[in-house]
Amino acid sequence: MSTVVARVYIVRHGETDANRQGIVQGQLDTPLNDAGVEQARLTADALEDTPFEVAYSSDLQRARRTAEIILEKHPGVKLETTPALRERYMGDWQGVSIAGRGVPPENAEPTIDFTARSAKWWNEAVLRHAQRKASELQLKLKFAQAQNGHANARNGSAVNGLASAEPHTEPDVELEFEPVHILAVSHGGLIGTLVTNLLRSRKLRAGEGVVIWRCFNASISVVDLYEDGKGVLVSYADTTHLNVVDMVQENADVARG
C-alpha cells in the first residue's frame, strides 16, 4: 500500500464586506470584515494541532491575513505569499454587483490562463515538497532494509516525481515517517478551478462521499498525495469548524456567464 507523503490543507479566506454585498472582487485588495476575522480564528483553532511545515497564501490581504491568523498558532512556520494564488482577474467586473451579470468581460483573465496559473503553482510548490518527502521515505526504507536485512521489503519508487510505478509489498520494518503538512490559503474561484482541474486530469480522485460544490469562506479542503504520484481529495470546502450560521452562500467571483 502506498504511503502518504504530503497532506495539503487548502483554505479559502475569511469573509469580506464585498462577499457579503455580492460584489465581484477578483484581484481587488479587500480586507477581512469582523466576521471574516472570526472565521479565520475558528479555522486556526481547527488546525491548531496540524504540524504544518510549509505555508503559502495569495498576496491579497484577505487571504494573507487569514493565513497569518492561522499561523499565530504555528509560530515556527514562515508564510510565503505569492500572486500565483490570487483570485481570477475579473476586469471590468471588479467592484461590480453580482446582480445582472452576463458573459465575463473581454479584459477578464481567460479561463485557460487562470487554470494554467493554478496548476503551475501546484506543480512547482506542492509537488516539489511531495517529491522531497517521497525521496526521504525511500532513503529510510533502504536504510531500514540494510540495517535489518530485509531483502524482500518493498521496493521504492520516485517516479512521476514521486515514486516508481513498480508494485511493492508492505515493509516488515517499522519506519518513523510523517508526511509534510502544507497550508495554502487562497480564493474560492482559484480553489474550485485548481481542484476541478486536478480531478479532470486524474491527478486526484475524490474520496468516498466527497462532493465538489460551493467553496465557502474559511472552508477547509484536504488533499493527500501518495508516494506513487497519486492523490486523493479527502474533503472539500468543509465548514464544520465554523459556528457562523449566516454564511455567504454565493461567491460573486465565480463567473457563471
What are the residue ranges of the model-derived segments?
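Short catalytic helix/loop segments, enriched in acidic residues and glycine
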Residues: 26-42
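Glycine-rich N-terminal loop/short-helix segment of MobA-like nucleotidyltransferase
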Residues: 15-29
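Short, conserved phosphate/pyrophosphate- and ester-handling motifs at nucleotide-, phospho-/glycolipid
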Residues: 13, 36, 187
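Internal catalytic-core helix/loop-beta-alpha segment
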Residues: 106-169
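Generic beta-sheet signal
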Residues: 8, 180-189
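Phosphate-coordination/substrate-recognition cap region in phosphate-metabolizing enzymes
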Residues: 41-108, 124
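Short beta-strand scaffold positions
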Residues: 57-58, 116, 185-186
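Acidic, low-complexity terminal tails and accessory targeting/binding regions
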Residues: 2-6, 91-97, 147-180, 196-257
